[in-house]
Amino acid sequence: MDYLKVSSNGELHIVGMNTNSIRKITKDGKIVKVAGRGYQGYSGDGGPATKAMLKSPLAIAFDSKNNMYITDMGNNRIRKVDAKGIISTFAGSGNFGWAQDGETVEIYLHKFP
């Protein structure tokens, strides 16, 4: 199953849960990889998102600065790709579970965020 989202600059982004990647269709019709290497895993924080590994990404969202947030479901994390294409972990430690009141979001991220 794929998830589609349009960014603020009008580009259509495609979340490939089975391809472990995020691609976009540019305004001139080209398909460009944005994040993920195409096979599952966890790596890449601090480097180019196109060289990072994702595991079953589910959905994406954009903030006002056009940073992209990826629900990296298989890794129990939310990953952030900044406007320069650098990926980082925004939330989650990779542990499955529920956070209790007062705990930080980095401790747990539910399996299906």
Annotate the PLM regions.
Residues 11-13, 67-70:
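Conserved beta-propeller blade signature
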Residues 6-9, 62-65:
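Residue-level detector of Asp-centered blade-edge/turn motifs that repeat once per structural unit
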Residues 1-3, 30-56, 86-113:
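Gly/Pro-rich loop segments of beta-rich domains
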Residues 17, 73:
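Short loop/turn segments immediately following the C-termini of beta-strands
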Residues 20-24, 30, 76-80, 86:
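A short loop-to-beta-strand structural motif that recurs across blades of beta-propeller domains
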